[in-house]
């Protein structure tokens, strides 16, 4: 009887361990896929543009335009100052490290963190390689143009939006427990 109980516990631990490994593989694949898609898209855009600010008209609301961004997502915090550039790069590095630790948790948020890390790694590599990040997606409605952005920015933003939605709609009980 005791032997069967011990065997059942070890089988449960084995299944749990296999599930953790499977989830880690999924999260790593998500990060790597986002990073790879981002880097390939940037490589392609850089290769077809001869000059910065050249335009490729795709539709009535979408263009490709190469912009070199020294700030963070959507051109925010672009100071043209080496100190701030280095500070932002250092902060991004530490945010990626923190998110990698959060990804190890086995909860729904870890997949959203994986999306953020995939995008952040793509932009971080560009900051190191090019000293700026190539942005190229120019979404606009008539003459109103949104910030020019890239694939990495999309996944960072999507991950953050998913985290916010999860907190607002799916973690109501946790917020009530803290009160």
Describe every region a protein language model picked out.
Residues 2-179:
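Alpha-helical transmembrane bundles and membrane-interface segments of multipass inner-membrane proteins
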């Amino acid at each position: 009887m005791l032997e069967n109980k011990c065997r059942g516990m070890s089988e449960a631990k084995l299944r749990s361990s296999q599930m953790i490994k499977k989830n880690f593989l999924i999260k790593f694949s998500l990060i790597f896929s986002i990073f790879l898609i981002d880097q390939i898209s940037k490589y392609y855009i850089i290769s077809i543009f001869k000059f910065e600010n050249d335009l490729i008209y795709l539709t009535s609301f979408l263009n490709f335009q190469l912009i070199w961004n020294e700030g963070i997502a959507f051109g925010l915090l672009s100071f043209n100052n080496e100190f701030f550039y280095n500070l932002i790069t250092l902060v991004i590095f530490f945010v990626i490290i923190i998110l990698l630790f959060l990804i190890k948790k086995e909860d729904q948020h870890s997949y959203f963190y994986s999306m953020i890390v995939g995008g952040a790694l793509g932009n971080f590599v560009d900051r190191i390689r090019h000293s700026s990040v190539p942005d190229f997606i120019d979404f606009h409605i008539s003459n109103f143009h949104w910030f020019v952005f890239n694939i990495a920015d999309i996944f960072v933003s999507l991950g953050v939006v998913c985290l916010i939605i999860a907190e607002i709609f799916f973690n109501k009980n946790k917020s009530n427990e803290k009160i």
